[in-house]
């Protein structure tokens, strides 16, 4: 009798867990976020960089952001740059700090920042978060989290062609 009761309880627990799991795994739906247009004078951008401008990678983002702000006719005080932000919890803290300073658009430039930026995006649905080199925006389906990643296959192809030409130059045999 005890075995039957135990088996019944376990079956009920399993079915309950299965139903809860199926209901909770509604991953095909995008999280509904109502992002309203931002008036030009209300735009405030935060930029989170792994290193400072001494790193050519980060300098590229810093210079591009400065140029974008200028081209859009935004004021200098509409951009806050945070450099030297490691791929740790400090990235999340920095993103939240930027939100608290009024930033409504936040960019991060390091692959390792992604999980921290996603967490901030989840907690701050009214702020737009952009992550360079990220890969999870299309799978996580946050309405306010976006990835920016170039199609780099062209560059890889050209690098391969250049390497092949160098081999021919060095060894003189294009036929292998």
Which positions does each model-derived feature cover?
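Positively charged n-region of N-terminal signal peptides that target proteins for export
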Residues: 1-10
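C-terminal motif of bacterial Sec signal peptides marking the signal peptidase cleavage site
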Residues: 21-24
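Bacterial signal peptide processing site
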Residues: 26-28
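Extracytoplasmic "Venus flytrap"
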Residues: 31-40, 44-64, 68-69, 81-91, ...
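Periplasmic-binding protein-like
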Residues: 47-48, 100-111, 128-132
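An alpha-beta-alpha
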Residues: 65, 156-176
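Short, well-structured alpha-helical segments in soluble
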Residues: 88-103
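Flexible loop/hinge segments that line or gate small-molecule binding clefts
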Residues: 122-149
